[in-house]
Amino acid sequence: MRVLVIEDNEDFRKLALTWFQSYGIEVEGAANGAQGLALQRARPADVIVTDIFMPEMEGIETIHDLRKEFPEAKIIAMSGRDPLANLDVFEVARQVGAAKTFSKPFKFEDLIAAVRELSGAKEQRAP
């Protein structure tokens, strides 16, 4: 299984890459939506995890463009904004193609479970 993480916060992106790798999941990271689209075109991921609020190309636009080019893409949207404020933006994210949404902070194990569910992969515990 291969995962693409699109996240502008470098610390969070590096942490996510480390977590996915610890579960034996091949992962690549992008700092914004434009980079994410380029990586998806070059080496399509099974699941894409994207932040919603990013500079250059916001997550909603990224999800829309990913869905347009990759209609079968499995996409998870996440946001660190206030959970109540996220309700509306998560609804829009689902309307444009996100299968699941997460409010930061979240348990990384829950994200792993969602990625595995969407990809159809069997569970593997971190060492």
Where do the protein language model's features map onto the residues?
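Conserved acidic carboxylate
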Residues: 7
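Two-component/phosphorelay signaling modules centered on CheY-like receiver
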Residues: 10-28, 96
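Helix N-cap/capping motif at the beta->alpha junctions
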Residues: 29-38, 59
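Short amphipathic alpha-helix used as the core "switch/output" element in two-component signaling
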Residues: 38, 60-72
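Active-site residues of response regulator receiver
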Residues: 51
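Receiver (REC) domain active-site loop signature in two-component systems and cognate sites
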Residues: 54
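Alpha4 helix (beta4-alpha4-beta5 surface) of REC/receiver domains from two-component response regulators
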Residues: 61, 82-102, 109
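C-terminal output helix
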Residues: 103-117
